[in-house]
């Protein structure tokens, strides 16, 4: 079980680092002001939680199947 927890933590760190490492184009000053006014800080957290709740159980079940096979 400790192995699965370690694998899950590594998966999370790698996935989150890819999200934050992606380059984004510079927005125009007008668009940036509009985006700041409409920004939703909870949107990013929701996306991460969605990945964790859907991807992590699938990864764990895949690892369990591979361990049972070999």
Curated annotation (Swiss-Prot):
One of its GO terms (molecular function) is toxin activity. It is found in: Secreted; Target cell membrane. Keywords: Allergen, Amidation, Antimicrobial, Cytolysis, Formylation, Hemolysis, Ion transport, Membrane, Porin, Secreted, Signal, Target cell membrane, Target membrane, Toxin, Transmembrane, Transport. One of its GO terms (biological process) is monoatomic ion transport. Residues 22-43 form a propeptide. Residues 1-21 form the signal peptide. The record marks 57 as: Important for the flexibility at the center of the helix, flexibility that is important for the stability of the voltage-gated pore. The modification N-formylglycine is found at residue 44. Expressed by the venom gland. Pfam families: Melittin. The keyword Plastid does not apply. It comes from the Eukaryota. GO terms for cellular component: extracellular region; other organism cell membrane; pore complex. The keyword ATP-binding does not apply. The modification Glutamine amide is found at residue 69. Monomer (in solution and for integration into membranes), homotetramer (in solution and potentially as a toroidal pore in membranes), and potenially homomultimer (as a toroidal pore in membranes). Main toxin of bee venom with strong hemolytic activity and antimicrobial activity. It has enhancing effects on bee venom phospholipase A2 activity. This amphipathic toxin binds to negatively charged membrane surface and forms pore by inserting into lipid bilayers inducing the leakage of ions and molecules and the enhancement of permeability that ultimately leads to cell lysis. It acts as a voltage-gated pore with higher selectivity for anions over cations. The ion conductance has been shown to be voltage-dependent. Belongs to the melittin family. This is Melittin.
């Amino acid at each position: 079980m400790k192995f699965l927890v370690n694998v899950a933590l590594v998966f999370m760190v790698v996935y989150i680092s890819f999200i934050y490492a992606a380059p984004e184009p510079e927005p125009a000053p007008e668009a940036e002001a509009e985006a700041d006014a409409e920004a939703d800080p909870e949107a990013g957290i929701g996306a991460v939680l969605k990945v964790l709740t859907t991807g992590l159980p699938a990864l764990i079940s895949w690892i369990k199947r591979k361990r049972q096979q070999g």
